[in-house]
Amino acid sequence: MSSTAVVHDDDLMEPSLQSIVNQKTLRWIFVGGKGGVGKTTTSCSLAIQLAKVRKSVLLISTDPAHNLSDAFGQKFGKEARLVDGFTNLSAMEIDPNGSIQDLLASGDAQQDDPMAGLGVNNMMQDLAFSIPGVDEAMSFAEVLKQVKSLSYEVIVFDTAPTGHTLRFLQFPTVLEKALAKLSQLSSQFGPMLNSILGARGGLPGGQNLDELLQKMESLRETISEVNSQFKDADLTTFVCVCIAEFLSLYETERMIQELTSYSIDTHAIVVNQLLFPKDGSECDQCNARRKMQKKYLEQIEELYEDFNVVRMPLLVEEVRGKEKLEKFSDMLVHPYVPPN
């Protein structure tokens, strides 16, 4: 059900994320699932474990809710900054609803940056807005800025809820098609458009259409390169996060099928908020909920027998702050053993 992953046979059935931490070839790790299942806690905790064995780790939130700041108790923005208490773990929060001008920005930015200087007039902005998933494009554009710097050994994505996550992963293909169409129109109507733009003073920044297309083509090449990395199981994997309930299990199955259709590796599932009532517990609600969770947990283990299924307990306190995240992260690599 998962695409081929580079894991040792001994790790294949291990109920932990240790195999992902051990896989030194990984460059991109996505963490996603239905809303409210603990994606941010899981992604932060996984990043903490990776920081123990990697030179540099970048944690990126593409969720508009931006819970990284709440999780670490530290304000993050669109520029990467070190997480307090770490020397090799940085974090950033991208606003996928940011202005399209940030992506197609005019102006005087560096000439060697494919993201820079993409000045557009209203016609080009209208074209950009017509591209499906343009809000996710904003996130992807910010990611590419980090990629070009080559300063992080591994990047962990704390993604938006399921539907947005999958659109984000599809965006490279969408943009490639859109730019191909734009290039085709330019070859057919380029002289006429340049004439019209010239009469109106040209594009912002004094560019002509050909220069704009060259910069957009450079961006397309970068996106294409990253997209190919996403489909390489040596470089990329997707960690699914869920809870032991019907809707969450349904969303997880749908997500795994779609990830597989896009050739994106996934071989790990984190099941959060599990109850482990003590033997003889008189809490009827606890016992009933545990019975329900056990049913869906068994279905998960049956459906995904070739996955690393990590069972995480429901905790009595919120997992916020460095110390609590570190304790939670230990359970991702050392399977939780419920008390007797």
From Swiss-Prot:
One of the record's GO cellular component terms: GET complex
Gene Ontology MF term list: ATP binding; ATP hydrolysis activity; guanyl-nucleotide exchange factor activity; identical protein binding; metal ion binding; protein folding chaperone; unfolded protein binding
GO BP field: cellular response to oxidative stress; pheromone-dependent signal transduction involved in conjugation with cellular fusion; post-translational protein targeting to endoplasmic reticulum membrane; response to heat; response to metal ion; retrograde vesicle-mediated transport, Golgi to endoplasmic reticulum; tail-anchored membrane protein insertion into ER membrane
Transcription keyword on record: no
Binding site for Zn(2+): 283, 286
Location of the active site: 63
Keywords: ATP-binding, Cytoplasm, Endoplasmic reticulum, Hydrolase, Metal-binding, Nucleotide-binding, Transport, Zinc
Entry's EC annotation: 3.6.-.-
SUPFAM superfamilies: P-loop containing nucleoside triphosphate hydrolases
Top-level class of the enzyme under EC nomenclature: hydrolase
Binding site for ATP: 34-41, 245, 272
Subcellular location: Cytoplasm; Endoplasmic reticulum
UniProt function note: ATPase required for the post-translational delivery of tail-anchored (TA) proteins to the endoplasmic reticulum. Recognizes and selectively binds the transmembrane domain of TA proteins in the cytosol. This complex then targets to the endoplasmic reticulum by membrane-bound receptors, where the tail-anchored protein is released for insertion. This process is regulated by ATP binding and hydrolysis. ATP binding drives the homodimer towards the closed dimer state, facilitating recognition of newly synthesized TA membrane proteins. ATP hydrolysis is required for insertion.
Family of this protein: Belongs to the arsA ATPase family.
Subunit structure: Homodimer.
Protein name: ATPase get3
